[in-house]
A protein has these predicted regions:
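Acidic/polar loop-and-plug regions of large Gram-negative outer-membrane beta-barrel proteins
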Residues: 1-28, 53-106, 170-184
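Active-site loops and adjacent core secondary-structure elements that bind or stabilize anionic groups
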Residues: 41
Length: 265
């Protein structure tokens, strides 16, 4: 483990750590309408909560120093004689820096809420003809941000490498040149902070015909998928919500199968 090491207090440290929890809840209902038709419905929800460590720095060079290896080559900048990663050296560098921490650790949060409904109606129209049709509806919200969790002995951190890309016409705070160098503390957001929204609505149907050794079907579906984003990092509240974009999709399929005998078709 090229990132294994200790800080100046002898505490074990690491720059790679991931955790994720994603429970799923579903409610299913089966309705036998009559002897030839039925309705199957599932309502479900997925709750995802997780994060992983993400080393940040004032410059891209600083950020790369968090990597124990780079393309298979050992990073020796912060390396002790015994081979462990020298987290204490990062603390010393940050404490001595007059411009706050050069390297800090953030937690990359990636959460989601996913809701969905799937309902399928089946009807045995005749001995040889069966109809299946239904709806599929989903709504997905994902939350992504990077939160400072450790300044590594620096007094603050300035995320100027990211904030320099924020335009005043999109975020009024960027009109103040000092905002780019704001002195951030543990709990503040760096690099990104946004929510993504996705909704999908679809209908589908299939008609299947069976007669002795011959089976044929035709099916089709139509769906709409919409996207939009709410960005709190690069935009202020007046501009945070992006354009809503929708895409219509469809499928048409057909096929047939003939059973020559019990083993071949």
């Amino acid at each position: 483990n090229a990132e294994y090491g200790f800080d100046k207090n002898g505490r074990q440290r690491y720059s790679h750590f991931n955790e994720y929890h994603k429970p799923q809840i579903s409610l299913n209902h089966q309705w036998q309408i009559d002897y030839k038709s039925s309705l199957s419905t599932a309502l479900y929800m997925s709750i995802g909560r997780g994060s992983g460590y993400s080393g940040q720095g004032r410059t891209s060079a600083d950020r790369n120093m968090w990597k124990g290896t780079n393309y298979g080559v050992l990073n020796t900048t912060f390396r002790n004689p015994d081979g462990t990663f020298a987290y204490d050296k990062i603390q010393e560098m940050n404490a001595a820096s007059p411009d706050g921490s050069r390297m800090i650790m953030s937690k990359s949060n990636n959460n989601h809420m996913w809701y969905g409904l799937l309902s399928t109606y089946t009807n045995q129209i005749s001995k040889s003809l069966e109809l299946s049709a239904g709806i599929d509806v989903r709504y997905y919200i994902d939350e992504h941000n990077n939160e400072i969790i450790d300044l590594y002995d620096g007094k603050y951190f300035s995320d100027d490498s990211s904030r320099a890309n924020v335009k005043p016409e999109q975020n009024a705070a960027a009109a103040d040149p000092n905002w780019v160098y704001e002195k951030l503390q543990v709990g503040d957001k760096v690099y990104r902070d946004y929510d993504g929204h996705v909704h999908q609505e679809g209908v589908f149907a299939q008609l299947e015909w069976t007669k002795k050794n011959l089976n044929a079907f035709v099916s089709g579906s139509v769906s709409n998928t919409g996207y939009w984003r709410y960005d709190r990092f690069y935009y202020d509240a007046a501009h945070a919500e992006s354009e809503h974009v929708n895409f219509i999709g469809y499928t048409v399929k057909g096929g047939a199968n003939y059973n020559i005998n019990e083993k071949h078709n």
